Structure formats: structure tokens, C-alpha cells
Amino acid sequence: MERGMRLFSSLVLVLLLVTATEMGPKVAEARTCESQSHRFKGACLSDTNCASVCQTEGFPAGDCKGARRRCFCVKPC
């Protein structure tokens, strides 16, 4: 009986923790739009270099992505 009560208490505690984390304030994540850089040449090995080129194209940021290491410029949609 004591073991069953302990198991029940543990399950209730886990249930309360799960529901409490979902009751917090909801923050809407901004969508991001990506566009392959038109000015970046060669393999993209540095996110910093990619971001610099993307800024000249009017984007606030840029990242190297994919197996072929291409520079993608990123902005909020």
C-alpha cells in the first residue's frame, strides 16, 4: 500500500510539473526568412564573413548552411 501511494504521489508531482511549465506566458516566435546570398563567392566557412556580405545586401544576419556550405542571408519575415 505504501509503495502504491508513493508511486501515485510521484505521478501527481510529475503531472503538476508538466502542466505548470505549459501555463507560462506564450511568446510568439518570429519567423525567419532565408535567401541565398548573391554576392558571397566560394565555400562558406565563416558565419562572420557570411553575415558581413549579407549586411551589404540589406540583411541583418547570415549563416553558413548545408553540406555544400552556402551563405544564406536571414531576416525576420
UniProtKB/Swiss-Prot annotation:
GO annotation terms (biological process): defense response; defense response to fungus; killing of cells of another organism
Entry keyword Magnesium: no
Disulfide bond residue pairs: 33-77, 44-64, 50-71, 54-73
Pfam families registered for this protein in UniProt: Gamma-thionin
Principal location class: secreted
Example of a GO cellular component annotation carried by this entry: extracellular region
Gene3D superfamilies associated with the record: Knottin, scorpion toxin-like (3.30.30.10)
Parts of the chain that traverse the membrane: none
Location within or outside the cell: Secreted
InterPro entries: Defensin_plant, Scorpion_toxin-like, Scorpion_toxin-like_sf
Family: Belongs to the DEFL family.
Protein name: Defensin-like protein
Species of origin: Nelumbo nucifera (Sacred lotus)
Classification lineage: Eukaryota, Viridiplantae, Streptophyta, Embryophyta, Tracheophyta
